[in-house]
C-alpha cells in the first residue's frame, strides 16, 4: 500500500540524444499525484537511438534510502529489472529530479525482433522498503522516427 503524500510528481520528460522535432519530449501529468500512469499515451523511439527519462518530483517528509525499482515489460511479458538508488531526501524539497539511467543513455534495440511496445513500471520505495509512489509509462520502438510525438 502506498503511503500517500510523501512523494508527489511534477513532470515527465523523455530526452533524446538525437530526434527530429527537438531533443526533449514533455508529457503532461497530473501534478501532485503519487501514482502516475501514462501507459495509454506511449511515445515512439527509433531503434538504435539513445534516450533517458527525467521525472520531476517533490518530497513532503524526509525519506531515508530512497530507491526506484524499475520493471520493464515487452508486450505484457516481463523483460528486465533494475534498481537505482536515489539516497536520502530532506523534507519539503520541491525541485527534485530522477534520471534513468542516472549516467549515460539507454539505447533502443535495432533488432526487428525487439521492435514493439514496452511498458516501464517504476516503484519508489524508502523508509525501510515502504511503498511511496509509482510511475508507469510506455513507449514503442519503431524502425524510424515517424509519429515521434505521443499518441493521444
Swiss-Prot record:
GO cellular component: cytosol; membrane
Primary residence: cytoplasm
Molecular function, one GO term: GTPase activator activity
Gene3D superfamilies found in the cross-reference section: Coagulation Factor XIII, subunit A, domain 1 (2.70.50.30)
Location in or out of the cell: Cytoplasm
Alphabetical keyword list: Cytoplasm, GTPase activation
GO BP term, pick one: Rho protein signal transduction
InterPro entries for the chain: Ig_E-set (IPR014756), RhoGDI_dom_sf (IPR024792)
Family of the protein in this entry: Belongs to the Rho GDI family.
Function: Regulates the GDP/GTP exchange reaction of the Rho proteins by inhibiting the dissociation of GDP from them, and the subsequent binding of GTP to them.
Protein's UniProt name: Putative rho GDP-dissociation inhibitor 2
Organism: Dictyostelium discoideum
Species classification: Eukaryota, Amoebozoa, Evosea, Eumycetozoa, Dictyostelia
Amino acid at each position: 500500500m502506498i503511503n500517500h503524500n510523501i512523494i508527489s510528481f511534477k513532470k515527465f520528460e523523455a530526452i533524446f540524444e538525437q530526434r527530429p522535432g527537438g531533443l526533449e519530449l514533455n508529457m503532461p501529468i497530473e501534478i501532485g499525484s503519487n501514482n502516475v500512469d501514462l501507459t495509454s499515451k506511449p511515445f515512439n523511439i527509433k531503434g538504435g537511438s539513445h534516450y533517458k527519462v527525467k521525472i520531476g518530483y517533490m518530497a513532503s517528509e524526509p525519506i531515508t534510502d530512497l530507491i526506484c525499482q524499475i520493471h520493464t515489460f515487452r508486450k505484457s511479458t516481463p523483460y528486465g529489472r533494475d534498481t537505482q538508488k536515489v539516497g536520502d531526501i530532506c523534507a519539503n524539497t520541491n525541485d527534485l529530479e530522477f534520471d534513468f539511467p542516472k549516467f549515460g543513455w539507454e539505447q533502443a534495440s535495432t533488432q526487428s525482433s525487439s521492435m514493439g511496445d514496452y511498458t516501464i513500471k517504476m516503484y519508489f520505495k524508502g523508509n525501510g522498503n515502504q511503498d511511496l509512489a509509482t510511475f508507469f509509462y510506455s513507449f514503442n520502438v519503431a524502425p524510424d522516427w515517424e509519429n515521434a510525438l505521443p499518441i493521444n
